[in-house]
A protein has these predicted regions:
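S-adenosylmethionine/decaboxylated-SAM
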Residues: 3-189
Length: 189
């Protein structure tokens, strides 16, 4: 597609399988960077031939590749992913594109920010929806042990507060023996 994408190839393979199985009508991506993953998601969804929208949110759109920016099925928003206006936009898009949601969290990797993203999505995701928390492999899970509390710890904190919201898709997570989303493949109960 010609647009840079900072993702694990094995994770991207899993994501396309999840999209085909889930058939979401709305994809919510926190963390845009170049727009390569949003474009990838849009290409996969077009192959299924059903109405959909990709919403990609980032605090800065400066690095956004113009190729991705021109895609008619992607809405790029310059904002913090935890801003209440983002929740309002997701709620509106749910009305326009009813059905399943696939959410992927890959913006600020601090524990508090990821936890805030998960809490923002909590009332917006329904049973059967799918959420991936990326880069939960940092802070010693197994890489970058000195990073400090990050996405992995956010998942743990979220599950302490909301212990019955998600099941872990362990089979998908372990499929290739490596993932950037350690403990982060989550299906809403």
């Amino acid at each position: 597609m010609g647009v840079t994408c900072w993702k694990s190839v094995s994770d991207m393979w899993n994501y396309q399988e999840i999209l085909v199985d889930l058939k979401p009508s709305l994809i919510v991506e926190f963390g845009t960077r170049y727009g390569g993953s949003a474009l990838f998601f849009a290409h996969i969804m077009r192959q299924m031939g059903q109405p959909f929208r990709v919403l990609s949110v980032d605090v800065s759109q400066r690095a956004l590749d113009p190729i991705a920016g021109r895609d008619p099925d992607i809405t790029f928003v310059e904002s913090s992913s935890t801003d209440p206006s983002v929740a309002e936009q997701i709620q509106r898009l749910k009305g326009e594109y009813p059905g399943r949601i696939f959410a992927i969290l890959d913006s600020d990797h601090s524990m508090q920010h990821v936890l805030a993203e998960m809490k923002l999505l909590q009332p917006l995701l329904a049973p059967g929806d799918y959420m991936v928390v990326e880069d939960s492999n940092i802070n010693g899970h197994p890489v970058l042990p000195g990073f400090g509390p990050g996405p992995y710890e956010a998942i743990e904190a979220y599950e302490q507060e909301y212990p019955n919201n998600y099941t872990h898709d362990v089979e998908r997570e372990n499929k290739f023996g490596f993932t950037f989303a350690t403990n982060g493949f989550l299906i809403r109960k």
